[in-house]
């Protein structure tokens, strides 16, 4: 997520709704009353109405140490500055141009990015603001820590009815010896960049005065119209290699193809593949429906070519949306023109190679589905973009978009009644603060209710190699009752080596547990491949059970591991190394706040709740 850019898009909240605030018409403010009005709203200093004074104010503010955090500065400046423009009765185009010029002036991004990111989110955010009750200040506070007044949009709570009658809790099943197992490939966050150019700047933040460029390893020497830019004659600090770069760069196509060739030759006995979302590159300012359709079609053909006869089960990612994360539910006014039905239709067409028509019908409605990859095992692909904080359509009505959690409960209840076990694959881990609080907390309760039925859960989105434990806070011992596998990304974005995971799962016989028996993570050192000018060598990074000396993969074992990470510096250092796939040297091993962040992320089974971490003390 390129947060500074998205915040600029959010700046459109005020930029293009002119006289709308909190869903009611706002009376224009006279120029002579402007300073008194802005100071009354708690601003340290009023922004003078004339446009060029605003830009000088912004430049001064940027150079003050306390305002180095660009996300907050640009969000709050957009709020105050645009309010001043509104007071001058500026047109929508003038206001949009102000934001584009602001982005250009301070070198926040490439010129075409500055323009496109604002117009990409314009219609969605304007539409939502006109129908919501949140002020711009609440929105700034919601998305940026210590900025604005509130995080209310992200922490709105609502409840879904969960059936009672929970069966007695079963202990985590023990996998018997000498029973059949099967192999599953887990890919996530592939993010292929078809505009990756060898030799371009991989460390492009150095070309930005504020270090905010979000997408490197591309040719920015000319703009989208072919005119030369101010980067045309700049020296290259870190040239992009042919096999990808562990910087803010997505994956070159040939590295993706290298991974597919390696996996298909090495693992000829895959039973199926799970992909937990995100095929598109991180250039969200250039997303179009046609480009998404083309990319998804190409990706489907690749898997059909390299893995013929192997089912592929996919969950939708936030980067599949156009704009990014934009997936309006059916309750949204003007759904016919704003809904993602075009995307869901594409997915149903592509996925028809691997899932039956009954499941495709559900895909076309809510981009979720249920299939049976093995007898007695139901696999549920769950659309968690309905909990994304950047799916702005949800701020009109956050309550269970497209009744997806209600549908999930029905599927789980049906499986409980039949004695089936369930795997859930999805994109956004519900414990991540990217997931809205109301959705996350309801999902947490669903997992607790159906903990006997849900055998495993698999996620992506973060790009990191990590895990997440669910704790029963009603239990005096904080019983760990479930956990998430979170797969490392295939993309190198950002500061990572590409990776994938192979699971060996107990199953294929009567009474199987359908839990993971072993998990092995593989990666490629792209820096080494570039230096040798040879195709990457895909090698075993680690065997999870062996590396962490785990007796099993029960929630208790994962909880025990997280406790050891808190107390054992050597183990924690190793965890961080694997987290970044042997690339990033994070020097936070003895820093309390840094270690707290890593370990608390493990222990948070639901978003916006650090009560799970209150025992982590110095």
UniProtKB/Swiss-Prot annotation:
Alphabetical GO biological process terms: ceramide biosynthetic process; sphingomyelin catabolic process
CDD domains xrefs: MPP_ASMase
Pathway entry: Lipid metabolism; sphingolipid metabolism
Cleaved signal peptide residues: 1-22
A GO term from the CC aspect: extracellular space
GO MF: acid sphingomyelin phosphodiesterase activity; hydrolase activity, acting on glycosyl bonds; metal ion binding; sphingomyelin phosphodiesterase activity
UniProt domain Saposin B-type: residue ranges: 68-151
Subcellular location: Secreted
EC assignment: 3.1.4.12
Keywords: Disulfide bond, Glycoprotein, Glycosidase, Hydrolase, Lipid metabolism, Metal-binding, Secreted, Signal, Sphingolipid metabolism, Zinc
Chief localization: secreted
Residue positions binding Zn(2+) 1: 189, 191, 278, 463
Glycan attachment sites: 89, 159, 298, 525, 568
Protein name: Sphingomyelin phosphodiesterase 2
């Amino acid at each position: 997520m390129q947060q500074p850019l998205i915040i600029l898009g959010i700046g459109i909240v005020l930029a293009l709704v002119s006289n709308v605030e909190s869903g009611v018409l706002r009376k224009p403010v006279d120029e002579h009353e402007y300073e008194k009005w802005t100071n009354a709203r708690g601003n340290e200093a009023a922004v003078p109405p004339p446009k060029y004074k605003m830009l000088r104010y912004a430049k001064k503010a940027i150079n003050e140490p306390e305002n180095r955090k660009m996300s907050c500065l640009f969000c709050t400046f957009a709020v105050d500055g645009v309010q001043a423009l509104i007071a001058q009765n500026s047109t929508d185009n003038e206001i949009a141009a102000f934001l584009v010029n602001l982005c250009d002036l301070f070198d926040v991004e490439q010129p075409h990015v500055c323009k496109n990111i604002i117009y990409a989110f314009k219609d969605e955010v304007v539409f939502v603001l006109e129908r919501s009750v949140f002020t711009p200040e609440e929105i700034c506070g919601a998305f940026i820590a210590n900025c604005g007044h509130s995080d209310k949009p992200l922490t709105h709570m609502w409840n879904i009815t969960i059936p009672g009658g929970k069966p007695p809790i079963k202990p985590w099943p023990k996998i018997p010896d000498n029973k059949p197992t099967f192999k599953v490939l887990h890919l996530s966050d592939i993010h292929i960049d078809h505009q990756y150019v060898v030799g371009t700047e991989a460390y492009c933040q150095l070309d930005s005065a504020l270090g905010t460029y979000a997408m490197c390893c591309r040719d920015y020497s000319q703009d989208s119209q072919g005119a030369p830019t101010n980067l045309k004659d700049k020296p290259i600090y870190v040239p992009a290699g042919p096999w990808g770069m562990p910087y803010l760069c997505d994956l070159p196509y040939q590295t993706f193809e290298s991974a597919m060739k390696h996996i298909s030759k090495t693992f000829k006995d895959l039973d199926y593949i799970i992909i937990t979302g995100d095929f598109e590159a991180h250039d969200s300012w250039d997303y179009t429906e046609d480009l998404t359709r083309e990319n998804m079609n190409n990706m489907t053909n690749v898997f059909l070519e390299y893995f013929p006869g192997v089912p592929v089960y996919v969950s939708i990612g936030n980067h599949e949306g156009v704009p990014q994360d934009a997936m309006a539910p059916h309750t949204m006014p003007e759904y016919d023109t704003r809904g993602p039905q075009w995307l869901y239709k594409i997915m149903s067409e592509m996925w028809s190679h691997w899932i039956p028509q009954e499941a495709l019908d559900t895909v076309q409605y809510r981009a979720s589905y249920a299939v049976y990859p093995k007898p007695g095992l139901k696999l549920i692909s769950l659309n968690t973009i309905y909990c994304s904080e950047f799916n702005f359509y949800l701020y009109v009505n956050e309550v269970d978009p497209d009744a997806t959690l209600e549908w999930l409960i029905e599927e789980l209840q049906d499986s409980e009644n039949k004695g089936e076990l369930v795997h859930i694959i999805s994109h956004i881990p519900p414990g991540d603060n990217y997931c809205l609080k109301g959705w996350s907390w309801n999902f947490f309760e669903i997992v607790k209710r159906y903990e006997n039925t849900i055998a495993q859960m698999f996620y992506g989105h973060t790009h990191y190699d990590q895990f997440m434990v669910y704790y029963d806070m009603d239990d005096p011992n904080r019983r760990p009752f479930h956990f998430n596998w979170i797969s490392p990304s295939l993309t190198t974005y950002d500061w990572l080596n590409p990776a994938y995971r192979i699971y060996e799962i107990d199953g294929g016989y009567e009474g199987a547990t359908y839990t993971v028996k072993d998990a092995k993570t593989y990666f490629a050192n792209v820096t080494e491949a570039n230096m040798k000018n040879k195709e990457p060598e895909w090698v075993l990074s680690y065997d999870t059970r062996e590396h962490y000396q785990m007796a099993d993969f029960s929630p208790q074992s994962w909880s025990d591991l997280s406790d050891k990470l808190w107390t054992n510096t050597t183990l924690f250092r190793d965890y961080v190394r694997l987290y970044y796939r042997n690339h990033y040297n994070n020097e936070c091993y003895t820093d309390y706040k840094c270690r707290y962040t890593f370990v608390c992320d493990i222990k948070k089974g639901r978003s916006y709740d650090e009560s799970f971490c209150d025992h982590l003390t110095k």
